[in-house]
Amino acid sequence: MDPKDRKKIQFSVPAPPSQLDPRQVEMIRRRRPTPAMLFRLSEHSSPEEEASPHQRASGEGHHLKSKRSNPCAYTPPSLKAVQRIAESHLQSISNLGENQASEEEDELGELRELGYPREEEEEEEEEDEEEEEDSQAEVLKGSRGSAGQKTTYGQGLEGPWERPPPLDGPQRDGSSEDQVEDPALNEPGEEPQRPAHPEPGT
């Protein structure tokens, strides 16, 4: 039942305008122009007629207005304008760099006046580190030169410490110890052979 009622409503809608007076029909047509009328107006009308109130009310005059050049539309800058922008940007960057460099120099001058030479302190720290590395290299050379001798060096970070003997020393000592221990190794080797003889007898 509902779909039939809807169809009846749809067919009954266009009927009333035929009962209106021809004057009212003309007024309605003027207020609501058809697309064909709008097309004709757009071809032959002047800008003043395009902005007429009845087209504003209809809302279709927007299509006509959109054909005009919109003052708010984005227009890309020309090559000359782009070059000017780039040059001004580069100049501002160079000015900023110069200002920063001059500010740093001023700060360094003030710090030197106050007695805080930063650069000199950094150089001294680097020299101290190089001296420590040189002293460590000398210690390693000295330990290699004294083969097998335990040498004590100056205090380290945690206190006095002894460097273990280098690898060259124990090999020499170990070779002599192995020669001394060889007969001792042979003796225990002979001991298991002695009980091995009575086992087959038992």
Curated annotation (Swiss-Prot):
The modification N-acetylmethionine is found at residue 1. Residues 1-202 are annotated as: Disordered. InterPro entries: PPP1R1A/B/C. One of its GO terms (biological process) is intracellular signal transduction. It is found in: Cytoplasm. Its main location: cytoplasm. It comes from the Eukaryota. Keywords: Acetylation, Cytoplasm, Phosphoprotein, Protein phosphatase inhibitor. The keyword Phosphoprotein applies. Residues 89-100 have a biased composition (Polar residues). The keyword Ligase does not apply. Residues 119-136 have a biased composition (Acidic residues). This is Protein phosphatase 1 regulatory subunit 1B. It comes from Bos taurus (Bovine). The lineage of its organism: Eukaryota, Metazoa, Chordata, Craniata, Vertebrata.
